């Protein structure tokens, strides 16, 4: 398939991003695991892995956002009070993993690749950072709200919202109006046609990184379920700091070592739980 040329893309950057990622969205939307997820087929242990993954992603993303908050290539879409998720995820991880959560949450190779790419962009190509921010934050603000309700019911979580702070945006009164504001600010970013095309390609990379992460966690759960905790499985390690990881590049991982997990739940339920990573982005971007 030929890649659309910059002058054939929609004029607004937000519409161009939506159009360019339509194909990968369709693949996620039509997948059986996504349809079944919406039926509430979720496990607690799988959900814990998802939340750990999101934590690593947002620590890196928000570190780079802070680095570039005064840069003209990002400043117009800098909304820390409204959007930043690190603090909320810290609350959730304490709920799911206990007070020593930082010592036990997993940090897989795919998570490391995602983190590495975010740091690369923030430090060397900050004009591309908006692609990751838009893909993640607006996805969480939109589709994440749907998935929050599903997870709350399926996992029998407290009505107070404990364990789901990630999905709550207390400083946004109207998600619809805020998304309109964000898109307007993003569309106002000044960039050459060449940079614009690179931003569009980076949005595709953001989807790819999410899908790779999903595939890795899915593989983790396909192996035998012996006496091993997900956070201590072979090939996993805990993240000691926010430093850039010298791990593998963004290409699809191959030859990964077998990873084990303790859950006795049917494989299908695990896979559906981990589809959350793809579903949040896919549902979110196209519910806007």
UniProtKB/Swiss-Prot annotation:
Annotated site (Important for catalytic activity): 140
Source taxon at top rank: Eukaryota
Ranges where the record places region Disordered: 223-260
Catalytic activity: heme b + 3 reduced [NADPH--hemoprotein reductase] + 3 O2 = biliverdin IXalpha + CO + Fe(2+) + 3 oxidized [NADPH--hemoprotein reductase] + 3 H2O + H(+)
Residue positions where Phosphoserine is found in the record: 229
GO cellular component: cytosol; endoplasmic reticulum; endoplasmic reticulum membrane; extracellular space; membrane; mitochondrial outer membrane; nucleoplasm; nucleus
Keyword Membrane recorded: yes
Residues binding heme b: 18, 25, 134, 183
Ranges of the Cytoplasmic topological domain: 1-265
Topological category with respect to the lipid bilayer: Single-pass type IV membrane protein
Keyword Transmembrane helix tagged: yes
Enzyme Commission code(s) on record: 1.14.14.18
First-listed, main subcellular location of the protein, grouped into a coarse class: endoplasmic reticulum
PTM remark: A soluble form arises by proteolytic removal of the membrane anchor.
Residues annotated as transmembrane: 266-288
Tissue specificity statement from the Swiss-Prot or TrEMBL entry: Expressed at higher levels in renal cancer tissue than in normal tissue (at protein level).
Effect of mutating residue 270 to N: Significant reduction in catalytic activity, reduced oligomerization, reduced endoplasmic reticulum localization with cytoplasmic mislocalization
CDD domains: HemeO-like (cd00232)
GO biological process entries: angiogenesis; cellular response to arsenic-containing substance; cellular response to cadmium ion; cellular response to cisplatin; cellular response to heat; endothelial cell proliferation; epithelial cell apoptotic process; erythrocyte homeostasis
Inducing factors: Heme oxygenase 1 activity is highly inducible by its substrate heme and by various non-heme substances such as heavy metals, bromobenzene, endotoxin, oxidizing agents and UVA.
Subunit record text: (Microbial infection) Interacts with SARS-CoV-2 ORF3A protein; the interaction promotes ORF3A-induced autophagy but is unlikely to be involved in ORF3A-mediated induction of reticulophagy.
Disease field: Heme oxygenase 1 deficiency: A disease characterized by impaired stress hematopoiesis, resulting in marked erythrocyte fragmentation and intravascular hemolysis, coagulation abnormalities, endothelial damage, and iron deposition in renal and hepatic tissues. Clinical features include persistent hemolytic anemia, asplenia, nephritis, generalized erythematous rash, growth retardation and hepatomegaly.
Domain notes: The transmembrane domain is necessary for its oligomerization.
PANTHER family: HEME OXYGENASE (PTHR10720), HEME OXYGENASE 1 (PTHR10720:SF1)
The family this protein is said to belong to: Belongs to the heme oxygenase family.
Protein name: Heme oxygenase 1
Organism: Homo sapiens (Human)
Lineage: Eukaryota, Metazoa, Chordata, Craniata, Vertebrata
């Amino acid at each position: 398939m030929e890649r659309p040329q910059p002058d054939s893309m929609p004029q607004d950057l937000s519409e161009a991003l939506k159009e360019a990622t339509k194909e990968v969205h369709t693949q996620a939307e039509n997948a059986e695991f996504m349809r079944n997820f919406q039926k509430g087929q979720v496990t607690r242990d799988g959900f814990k892995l998802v939340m750990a993954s999101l934590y690593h992603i947002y620590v890196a993303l928000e570190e780079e956002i802070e680095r570039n908050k005064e840069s003209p290539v990002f400043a117009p879409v800098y909304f820390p009070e409204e959007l930043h998720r690190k603090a909320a995820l810290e609350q959730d991880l304490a709920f799911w993993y206990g007070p020593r959560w930082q010592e036990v949450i997993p940090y897989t190779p795919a998570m490391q690749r995602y983190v590495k790419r975010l740091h690369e962009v923030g430090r060397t190509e900050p004009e591309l950072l908006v692609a990751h921010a838009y893909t993640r934050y607006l996805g969480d603000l939109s589709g994440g709200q749907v998935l929050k309700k599903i997870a709350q019911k399926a996992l029998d979580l407290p009505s107070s919202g404990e364990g789901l702070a990630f999905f709550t945006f207390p400083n946004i009164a109207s998600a619809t109006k805020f998304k309109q504001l964000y898109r307007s600010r993003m569309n106002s970013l000044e960039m050459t046609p060449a940079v614009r095309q690179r931003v569009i390609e980076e949005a595709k990379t953001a989807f790819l990184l999410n899908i790779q992460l999903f595939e890795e966690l899915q593989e983790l759960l396909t192996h035998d379920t012996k006496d091993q905790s997900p956070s201590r499985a072979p090939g996993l390690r805990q993240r000691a700091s926010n430093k850039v990881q010298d791990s593998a590049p963004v290409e699809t991982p191959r030859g990964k070592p077998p990873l084990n997990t303790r859950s006795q739940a049917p494989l299908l339920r695990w896979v559906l739980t981990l589809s959350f990573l793809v579903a949040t982005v896919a549902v979110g971007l196209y519910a806007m």
